[in-house]
């Protein structure tokens, strides 16, 4: 187990949020990714399944950027595309040989598109909007041009935000994503429901589509492999139907996320792939105590217990003023 950081932060203003900043145990990863990296879980899961790997020197380079060419590689590995089959088939004029099979495969599958004038723009850094659109298409969204309305970025960001694709990612639509953020985005997609188009494609009158209505419905299935990722809704009214998440479909139930507890008996979950443990990670959504009214020092003392207070250091803020004393 990695060195444990003994820190616990409290934040108080109109509300108070409490969480112990100690990560759960995980398998060996990269030398530049440790407990302090909020994307450690995503990076290690994607390493285990072979979607994103590190540099030759053993680093993951979490803060490094990722290009559109490299994002095509990520998508090809994510979707297990036979990229060699598509070698030499892409329609773009600016794709280097090393990236050509991946870009070609993704273009053939409708996952990526060019930037105009026969160019793919592969050397450009991939933005949050671009990367999320690729992943949304993998989930089943935006299969028709009409889905975008008048602005593809607005439509993409709106729908991606609605399904929580940007959880744990601090970025805006046109910002270049870091490698760590891309890893988080992909992991979020793996835990998202796949969908089918159930809207109305309308009728074509000249160059105009009339009556088009974009609607998507979550896919369901009865196979137990569709109940291997724990991330909210799974069973539909006890009818044996499970919402199909991307990671369940792609990995045939071999990628698993199960409720667990860490070494401190805190609520956590453990990831595994093909029966091999990837790591155990604290479920931070349950490591929160929120107060919407005034809270006394005694209440905090009773919540934390005297042993915890003796063992850990505390910092909390009341209306912006820092204190470390709990009485």
Give names to the regions the model predicted.
Residues 2-40, 53-69, 75-101, 108-129, ...:
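Feature responds to low-complexity, polar/acidic, surface-exposed segments characteristic
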Residues 179:
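Extracellular structured ligand-interaction cores
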Residues 43-52:
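Mature N-terminal segment immediately following signal peptide/propeptide cleavage
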Residues 277-327:
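Structural detector for short beta-strands of small beta-barrel domains
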């Amino acid at each position: 187990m990695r060195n444990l950081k003994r820190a616990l932060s409290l934040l108080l203003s109109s509300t108070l949020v409490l969480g112990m900043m100690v990560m759960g145990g995980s398998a060996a990863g990269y030398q530049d990714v440790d407990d302090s990296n909020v994307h450690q879980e995503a990076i290690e899961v994607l390493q285990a399944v072979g979607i994103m790997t590190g540099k030759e020197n053993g680093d993951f380079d979490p803060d490094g950027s990722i290009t559109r060419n490299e994002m095509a590689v990520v998508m090809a590995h994510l979707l297990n595309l036979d990229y060699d089959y598509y070698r030499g088939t892409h329609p773009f004029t600016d794709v280097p040989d090393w990236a050509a099979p991946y870009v070609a495969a993704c273009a053939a599958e409708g996952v990526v598109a060019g930037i105009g004038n026969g160019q793919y723009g592969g050397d450009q850094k991939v933005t949050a909007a671009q990367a999320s659109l690729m992943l949304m298409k993998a989930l089943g969204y935006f299969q028709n041009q009409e889905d975008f309305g008048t602005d593809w970025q607005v439509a993409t960001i709106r729908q991606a935000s609605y399904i929580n694709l940007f959880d744990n990612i601090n970025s805006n639509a046109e910002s270049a994503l870091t490698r760590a953020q891309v890893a988080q985005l992909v992991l979020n997609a793996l835990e998202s429901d796949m969908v089918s188009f159930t809207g109305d494609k309308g009728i074509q009158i000249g160059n105009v589509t009339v009556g088009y209505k974009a609607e998507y419905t979550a896919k369901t299935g009865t196979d137990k492999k569709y109940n291997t990722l724990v991330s909210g809704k799974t069973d539909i009214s006890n009818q044996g139907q499970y919402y199909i998440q991307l990671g369940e479909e792609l990995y045939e139930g071999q990628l698993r996320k199960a409720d667990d507890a860490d070494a401190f008996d805190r609520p956590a979950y453990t990831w595994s792939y093909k029966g091999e443990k990837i790591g155990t990670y604290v479920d931070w959504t349950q490591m929160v105590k929120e107060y919407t009214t005034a809270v006394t020092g005694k209440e905090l003392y009773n919540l934390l217990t005297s042993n915890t207070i003796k063992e850990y250091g505390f910092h909390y803020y009341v209306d912006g003023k820092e204190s470390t004393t709990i009485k």
